[in-house]
A protein has these predicted regions:
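Autoinhibitory propeptides
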Residues: 10, 22-28, 51-142, 156-164, ...
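C-terminal subdomain of the subtilisin-like protease fold in secreted/lumenal serine endopeptidases
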Residues: 64, 272, 434-461, 497-503, ...
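Subtilisin-like serine protease catalytic core
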Residues: 131-252, 266-269, 295, 317-324, ...
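Structured lumen-facing ectodomains of secretory-pathway proteins
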Residues: 156, 197, 313-499
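Catalytic-core environment of secreted peptidases
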Residues: 183-192, 200, 378, 383, ...
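Hydrolase catalytic cores
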Residues: 210-214, 218, 244-245, 391, ...
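Beta-sheet-dominated interaction scaffolds and their linkers
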Residues: 481-488, 572, 581-623, 662-664, ...
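Surface-exposed binding patches on compact interaction domains or structured appendages
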Residues: 567, 594-597, 620-677, 770-809
Length: 863
């Protein structure tokens, strides 16, 4: 009966203050800390009042973190059911699970001895000129690195005149002058953090990003020396190192909030954070706190994510706030390859997977290309092609890597049977193909262009030998300077234009903890984000002020370089590159701006056909600007009735048309003009095409920097985008014990005793939903209650091993009788139940059932 009185007290109190909102987990890939919650209080509710409320509510809880700027706390309760009731506690505004963010995934390559050409990323962005001509270094700017810590002893972080870096809180002679370890080495996201204050990095990621922001390895004489000199974007910034990850594993979102608050209180001008997860929605505590900090004058950049192989709608949530910067990755100009030299030309190659070791053939062996009567290269699929050229002993046979008739395994076997000592495969399309090959035969794949050069050289002198390099060298690769394949596609769940901007993130050489080798190359949007952070620092120093984060984002976006993919004649979608590749030099020199810095046209139902922009002349003199529309690639994001966005959206030459109220506009110095744009949707009839482009204002003055803003939209009614993966039979019921799934597709009819056998629900979502519900109906289809399934994020198409990523939920037979858990859960009596999955359509009001995609599962019998 004690319970009843608790309920009464909650209900009485709840009538005074409206109940809070319990948020579902919207990260398709993240885990949660069991029974841990982040709660936000209503404005004006003090921590003491809130704790009184929690206590009267009889929730037994422990405080994990108390926050100050974010009005709330994180707590642990005894059971999941206690947590779900939190939303009804007076004074509570929002309740979230504590999500565990993965340590950002990067591709790591060991840095090889290279030459100075490889410091190419600053040429792409104007940062080299800012360093050399304008002497900008980010001096005086404070940058918070919320990450795995920083190896502060690294010589690349040494203060001027010192040979070694150091960390001292508020220390004048250390570049790492702020920071804290919130977690300890053994923390993995799920266990209890053991803060120790020392932000030394044992994982490596934070040291790498810190080096990109402002490491200086130009003149290092101590060991280990960098494989080549390099410098970060802003080599005199002061760092705060806020360590939120242990040596491995993830980090709880409540730790991240604490780190963000401390970074702000330490006076950081900019924080840079990149956290995994493909939420695509901004209603999470991190994004909310980020917005608050930005409104107080701090800037924040977050990684767009490395989910480029998962189709559209996959941007990570850290950069999704209205004022935060979501950063896409561009490939560096150069990549490192072993190479052959033939006729004096260096040709990068990639070795076959089956051979998988360096090729150490003598440098005296000639080539024998397999040619047809016209001199064209044959595919090497027919053994007769080999017998036609005579003995291949001590020779390198050359064939075309066309996969129509055979793969590299078949081609390699033929070469081996014919007695060849090695094989060179000429790629038949862009890039250097990867080869499966055969064990025992050295097989190397080269680009098509190099293959053609090789044949031309061979035609002149058949005796030329191939030599094989021992080292790697830098080569301009096919996608050099263009958006990285791995970089995630937007838009966000609300169809806003994200990512915002791009920066070099593919193949970036930077610092690494000394204990782990000191330097390495890494790739990821994690590498692009700190580049933007460093760019902020240079911009702030150039303007001798602390402009609002919004102003800097706008300046960087307005002046970025709009880019094309490799060999493409058209511009890459703004849903992939944002406003383009950052050009900090142009941002500093520009004498114009366009507000807002992105145009969200939304879908056909909510289409913004008329949009006003403000073009400002920030220079001293009158300037005439010409406005034009520069279309970018359209993306076909769905095919047929498939629930899943396409892994690789198909590029379509389709775009909106734009007319301007004025195509030419003369603006006096310091003044602005309002220009009205009229948009028309593209004519295409493909399914939910995502189209985009750029509105560009070009000044008449020769050499003056043009400014632009990206626009993005989706044609069609976004409410009709399918959400649940019914194509592949999900959601489906499975058989579980209390902790694990035992049979993922048990025979019909399902009977569960809730002692040994529990029903489990396996689901998979191909699109985000603003709200998901799981209802339980009895045998007469009457609503019994709701299951707090708590998951509404989109899953990636597959994990790293190619397996589908699934949501699995083991049901203990309990339901909440109201949707927002204002009463304790009940266990359903024995009987037959139908479980209904309901996902709210994007951009709908959320009326049930009209605005939901609904899937009724086969009945479940509870014995
Ligand atoms: C809680 O649920 C009740 C009944 O389902 C509903 O009337 C009320 O509006 C909900 N409150 C909130 C804050 O969602
Ligand atoms: C900076 O952002 C990158 C990418 O998001 C992230 O991996 C890294 O942890 C962040 N480091 C800083 C500077 O906070
Ligand atoms: C989707 O399926 C419906 C019904 O089967 C069919 O009428 C429609 O043409 C399909 N749409 C596409 C784009 O394939
Ligand atoms: C549930 O099944 C898993 C896998 O078969 C097993 O490891 C675990 O011990 C079982 N748990 C219980 C509570 O029986």
């Amino acid at each position: 009966m004690k319970i009843t009185s608790t309920i009464l007290s909650i209900l009485a109190a709840a009538s005074l203050v409206s109940a809070g909102k319990f948020h579902q987990v919207k990260h398709g890939k993240t885990n949660i800390v069991p029974n841990a919650y982040i709660i936000e209080y209503h404005e004006g509710v003090s921590h003491a009042d809130a704790h009184n409320g929690l206590k009267t509510h009889a929730v037994d809880y422990k405080v994990r973190n108390e926050y100050k700027i974010f009005n709330g706390a994180s707590i642990t309760v005894n059971s999941e059911h206690d947590g779900h009731a939190l939303a009804s506690v007076p004074g509570v505004k929002n309740v979230w699970h504590v999500s565990i963010y993965d340590m950002p995934k990067t591709q790591k390559v060991t840095a090889k001895k290279t030459d100075p050409l490889a410091i190419s990323d600053h040429h792409m962005t104007g940062v080299d000129v800012l360093h050399e001509k304008y002497k900008l270094t980010g001096k005086g700017v404070k940058v918070g690195v919320i990450d795995t810590g920083i190896d502060y002893n690294h010589p690349a972080f040494a203060a001027k005149g010192a040979t070694k870096g150091c960390f001292a809180r508020n220390g004048k002679n250390c570049r790492i002058a702020h920071g804290w370890d919130f977690v300890g080495d053994a923390y993995n996201g799920g266990n209890t953090p053991k803060p120790d204050g020392d932000p030394m990095d044992c994982a490596g990621h934070g040291s790498h990003v810190a080096g990109i922001i402002g490491g200086n390895a130009l003149d290092i004489k101590v060991n280990p020396k960098p494989p080549q000199p390099f410098v970060g974007v802003a080599p005199e910034v002061t760092y705060g190192a806020y360590r939120i990850f242990g040596c491995t594993g993830g980090s709880g979102e409540d730790v991240i909030l604490a780190a963000m608050e401390l970074a702000f209180n330490d006076g950081m001008d900019i924080i840079n954070m990149s956290l995994g997860g493909g939420s695509a929605y901004k209603d999470n505590p991190t994004a909310a706190l980020a917005e608050t900090l930005i409104s107080k004058g701090m800037a924040l950049s977050g990684a767009a994510g490395n989910d480029g192989a998962n189709g559209v709608w996959m941007v990570s949530d850290t950069g999704l706030g209205d004022h935060a910067t979501s950063v896409a990755s561009f490939d560096n100009m150069y990549d490192y390859y072993n190479y052959i030299t033939y006729g004096g030309v260096k040709m990068p190659f990639s070795v076959s997977e089956a051979y998988a070791k360096p090729i150490t053939l003598p440098n005296t062996l000639p080539i024998v290309p397999l040619l047809d009567a016209k001199g064209s290269l044959l595919d090497g699929c027919d053994p007769a092609q080999y017998t036609a050229v005579g003995s291949l002993k001590n020779k390198i046979v050359v064939a075309l890597g066309d996969v129509t008739n055979c793969k590299s395994g078949g081609r390699g076997a033929n070469a081996q049977n014919a007695g060849a000592t090695g094989m060179i495969v000429v790629s038949d399309d862009a890039g250097i193909d990867s080869l499966g090959g055969v064990a025992g035969l050295p097989m190397a794949s080269i680009s098509n262009a190099d293959g053609m050069t090789m044949l031309a050289t061979y035609a002149k002198n058949k005796k030329n030998a191939v030599s094989w390099s021992k080292d790697q060298g830098p080569f301009i690769i096919d996608n050099s300077g263009a958006p990285s394949d791995f970089s995630s596609f937007g838009l966000d769940g609300d169809l806003r234009s994200k990512p915002d901007i791009g920066a070099p993130g593919g193949n970036i050489l930077s610092t690494y903890p000394l204990a782990l080798g000191g330097y390495t190359l890494m790739s990821g949007t994690s590498m692009a984000t700190p580049y933007i952070t460093g760019s902020h620092a240079l911009y702030m120093q150039a303007k001798h002020a602390k402009p609002h984060g919004d102003v800097i984002r706008q300046a960087l976006k307005n002046t970025a370089t709009i880019s094309k993919n490799y060999k493409s004649k058209t511009f890459t979608s703004a849903a992939k590159q944002g406003a383009g590749l950052v050009n900090v030099l142009n941002a500093v020199l520009a004498e114009a701006s366009i507000t807002p810095d992105h145009i969200d046209l939304l879908d056909s139902v909510n289409f913004h056909k008329t949009v006003q922009i403000t073009l400002k002349n920030t220079g001293k003199h009158t300037e005439t600007f010409t406005l034009k529309n520069v279309p970018a690639d359209g993306l076909i994001s769905y095919q047929g009735n498939n629930t899943w966005p396409l892994a690789n959206p198909v590029i379509e030459a389709t775009s909106a048309s734009v007319t301007f109220s004025q195509e030419k506009v003369k603006i006096p110095g310091g003044k602005s003009a309002k220009i009205t744009l009229h948009f028309k949707e593209p004519k295409t009839n493909t399914l939910f095409p995502m189209y985009s482009g750029f509105v560009v204002a070009t000044p008449k003055t020769k050499g003056a920097v043009a400014v632009h803003v990206p626009y993005t939209g989706v044609k069609g009614d976004i409410r009709k985008v399918p959400i649940m993966d019914t194509d592949h039979g999900f959601p489906q019921a499975a058989l579980a014990n209390a902790t694990s799934i035992i049979d993922d597709a048990p025979a019909n009819p399902y009977t569960y005793d809730l002692v040994k056998n529990f029903p489990a629900f396996i689901s998979r979502f191909g699109s985000h939903t603003p709200n998901a519900e799981v209802r339980v109906l009895d045998s007469k289809d009457k609503l019994v209650g709701y299951i707090s399934f708590g998951e509404s994020g989109r899953q990636p198409l597959a994990d790293e091993n190619g397996n589908p990523v699934l949501n699995e939920y083991i049901w203990n037979g309990q339901v909440q009788t109201t949707q927002n858990a204002t009463a304790p859960a009940i266990t359903v009596p024995a009987g037959t139940y139908t479980v209904v999955f309901a996902q709210q359509h994007k951009f709908s009001k959320g009326e049930y059932p009209k605005d939901f995609e609904i899937f009724k599962m086969k009945p479940v019998t509870i014995a």
